[in-house]
Every structure is written in C-alpha cells, then in structure tokens.
Amino acid sequence: MQLTHVSQNGSGAYATGGDFERIFSEEMNRLYLLGLLLTVDARKAEQCFVEGLGNSVEGNPVFREWARSWARRRIIQEAIRMMEPAKEKLTITTEPVTLEIEPRLRAILELDALERFVFVMFVLEGYSYQDCSVLLGCSRRAVVNARTRALEHLANAAEIGALHGEGLQSTYSLVSN
C-alpha cells in the first residue's frame, strides 16, 4: 500500500507519525495480543501498546517499509523494559491472565517469563538467537535453553490439548501475521 503523506524531512521514504498511528489503529488487536502474550497482564499489555505508539511516533525516523515490523518491535521492547524477563528466576511463574482469552493461548501464558519472551520473539516473530540475546540482555545459551524449555512445555500442552480436541498451531497465526 502506497502512502501519500510525506515525512517532515521532505523524504517519502520515512514513516511519519501519521503512518504509525494508522498502523497501530489497523493492527490494534494483534499488537495488544503481542503485548499480552509477553506480559501476561492486561494493564501492562495496554501500557506496552500506548508507549509503543508514543515511541514510534516520536522516535527516530524509520523507513516506511519497516514501519509495521518496527511497531511490533516497539511493543516487544516496551514489554522487555517492563518485565525484565532475563532477571526473573526461572522457578517464578507469572499470575495468569484473568481476561477471557483463547484457550489455546493459555499454554504460552503459562510459560516462565524468559521462556515466554524467547518463544514469542524467536518462534512467532522470527528474531534470531543473537537478536533475542541482545534485546533480552542474556547470553545466547540462555536464549537457546529457554527456547528448548518453551517448546518442550508447549509440546506437552499440545499433546494434552490434542486429547481434548484443541490445537495450538492455529492460535500462533493470530499473533505472527
């Protein structure tokens, strides 16, 4: 889709505040769900959304082609800043979301914070091990181990879900599109 609005510096190559406002409006549900999967808290997910929008609009120029992925990255960065998942002990579990949520998402929400962040960033969003490591502030090995634990947990949940006729795979597409 070609945008006709030109950024303040005169170059149509960069996304404008209006472009980001449109993206956050059009993708509100997906961006909020991304924040919710990361924070497991409705208020924090909303805060990620609001701060992500504000930082996208007021932040450094971004190429227009990158604006949608940049919006998603801002949500992830806000969630990391709020939750500090690499500092959370692996044995501490987050209180479950009390909202009405897709039952198939519960397995993701039940992951420990670092596992959940790595799963969402690496598997759903396509970040590399290195990107996850840098953004989360932990070693690459910690990312690899967290991914392994997350996939094992989700595989077990999928087996249980299969017994009940539920599947996780279709749910992941809600977030990753």
Please report, for each region that a protein language model flagged, where it lies by residue.
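A short, charge-rich alpha-helical start-of-domain segment used by transcription regulators
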Residues: 2-33, 116
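Hydrophobic positions on the alpha-helical face of helix-turn-helix-like DNA-binding modules
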Residues: 52, 119, 132-133, 143
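Acidic, proline/glycine-rich intrinsically disordered inter-domain spacer in sigma factors
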Residues: 86-109
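Σ70-family region 2.3-2.4 aromatic/basic alpha-helix that recognizes the −10 promoter
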Residues: 28, 33-36, 46-89, 97
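Short amphipathic alpha helix immediately N-terminal
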Residues: 110-131
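DNA-recognition helix of helix-turn-helix
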Residues: 136-173
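Short amphipathic alpha-helical boundary/capping segments
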Residues: 9, 102-112, 139, 154
